[in-house]
Amino acid sequence: QQHKVLRVMGKKLTRKALEMLRKLSQKAAKDAEDAAEAAGDDEEAAATEGDDKDAEEKKDPYIEFWEAFGKNIKLGLIEDSSNRTKLSKLLRFKTSADGGDKWSSLEQYVGRMKEWQKSIYYISGKDMEEVKSSAFLERLMAKGLEVIFLTDPIDEYAIQNLTEFDGKKLQSVTKEGLKFGDEEDVDTKRAELYKEQMKPLTKWMKGVYGENVEKISVSVRLASTPCIFVTSQYGYSANMERIMQSQAFADNKRTQYLVSKKTMEINPRHPIVVELLKRSEEAPDSEETKD
């Protein structure tokens, strides 16, 4: 197996297979575009398009391949660094664009991005219900930003080996340092104002939680939720921690070492947080306030 000729043959076979899959995926995408244009010209077709959506997707030969062998493509993304760019174009994910019902490529995602959007956003979880209802999506949905849903245990491992696509950085919405790309001077000033306004509360809360949290900060990602816990930019996400801890031969000591402390983000506009700020200033030692 280590013979030079066999290694060369293996590389050529891999390239041929990837080229075949690329053509299959591109043909499927073109057929979908042609079908959409035809439906737009035909009122009757447009009226039945929604009913036939699932059937059309099942007929897509590349989607059939993806649903059967998608995990192998993701494994290739992890193990084959020389073909990572080619493999990334074969990936398919469900996203918030259509409620998580349809597969999309990263190229299609980039094509739908806002003009000012600089990152490809994703969220991971154990199932579709969990990621769809996540509080991490609140501000992104309000801004009309599309988020990729990662629900396969291997997804996050694969994405960690793909730091960017088409010049766009892949960013987890559950980690700190989240930015949207449309921030203006007024937004920056408002964020600084909230940070200064909430400083007494963040300092008091850090004293209450102590070593249980890394820090307390003011959130830019929350809209209707009072607070949330996020992981550090280079730490494991909560979903990745769950996967590691559930593995049969997991090293608990090593897992605990790699699990980072969480940062607690508070929503400065939420009534509960505003009231807590007031109480922390008026009665910081009160057991009722701490509870």
Show which residues each predicted segment covers:
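Conserved GHKL (Bergerat-fold) ATPase module
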Residues: 1-291
